[in-house]
Curated annotation (Swiss-Prot):
InterPro entries associated with the record: NADH_UbQ_OxRdtase_chain4L/K, NUOK/Mnh_C1-like
Enzyme kind, highest EC tier: translocase
Similarity field: Belongs to the complex I subunit 4L family.
PANTHER family, per the entry: NADH DEHYDROGENASE SUBUNIT 4L-RELATED (PTHR11434:SF21), NADH-UBIQUINONE OXIDOREDUCTASE SUBUNIT ND4L (PTHR11434)
EC number of the protein: 7.1.1.-
Protein name from the UniProt record: NADH-quinone oxidoreductase subunit K
Keyword entries, A-Z: Cell inner membrane, Cell membrane, Membrane, NAD, Quinone, Translocase, Transmembrane, Transmembrane helix, Transport, Ubiquinone
MF GO annotations: NADH:ubiquinone reductase (non-electrogenic) activity; quinone binding
Length: 106
């Protein structure tokens, strides 16, 4: 096999670092839209999962890959619940801006 076409651990870590930085920038640069903030959190979780799978494959241990599947399942449930809460909030208030969420009454 040609060594030029192999993808090593460093490549996976670089992609995960880019995903992590994009997620962090998405949270800090866009503080107005809640949906964009949720997508940025999902990008951060995806970066963590990619790191876990890359290190697990590099070390030859399947435990990290199985744990990454559990994290993906929890992240999918978290996204579904978060979007359902946002839909209900939008129906009640007519907006999902972060400033409007901060003005909730108890």
């Amino acid at each position: 096999m040609n060594s030029f076409m192999t993808v090593g651990l460093g490549h996976y870590l670089a992609v995960a670092a880019v995903l992590l930085v994009l997620g962090i920038f998405g949270i800090f640069l866009n503080r107005k839209n809640v949906i964009v903030m949720l997508m940025s959190i999902e990008l951060i979780l995806l970066a963590v999962n990619l790191n876990m799978v890359a290190f697990s494959a590099s070390l030859g241990d399947l435990a990290g890959q199985v744990f990454a599947m559990f994290i993906l399942t929890v992240a999918a449930a978290e996204a579904a619940i978060g979007l359902a809460i946002l839909v209900i909030y939008f129906r009640n208030r007519g907006s999902i801006q972060v400033e409007d969420v901060n003005l909730m009454k108890g």
